[in-house]
């Protein structure tokens, strides 16, 4: 998500980490071929345009409700649900900073 869409979804104090920084972290992963920043409320347009082989979402999403699932699976791609890393999130980092002050 773009910085603008993160602000719309999470509030005016977000994001903490810029879209460029988030993109750099993702692009550094060897399993990532391409990073796209989007401002729409959901990624369907980007998924349709890029036609990824793999779409990954966290397990907090119902697999049937993953946006773009049909697009990816229709061309033989995979949709994966992976658990979030416990204890690591922007919300947790913000709370730690608040309690440290």
Regions found by a protein language model. Give the residues of each.
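Nucleotidyltransferase catalytic core that binds NTPs
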Residues: 1-101
């Amino acid at each position: 998500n773009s910085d603008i869409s993160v602000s719309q979804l999470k509030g005016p104090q977000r994001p903490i980490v810029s879209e460029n920084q988030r993109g750099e972290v993702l692009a550094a992963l060897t399993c990532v071929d391409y990073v796209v920043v989007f401002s729409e409320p959901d990624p369907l347009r980007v998924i349709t345009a890029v036609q990824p082989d793999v779409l990954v979402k966290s397990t907090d999403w119902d697999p049937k409700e993953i946006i773009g699932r049909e697009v990816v699976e229709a061309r033989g791609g995979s949709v994966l649900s992976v658990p979030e890393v416990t204890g690591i999130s922007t919300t947790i980092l913000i709370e730690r900073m608040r309690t440290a002050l």
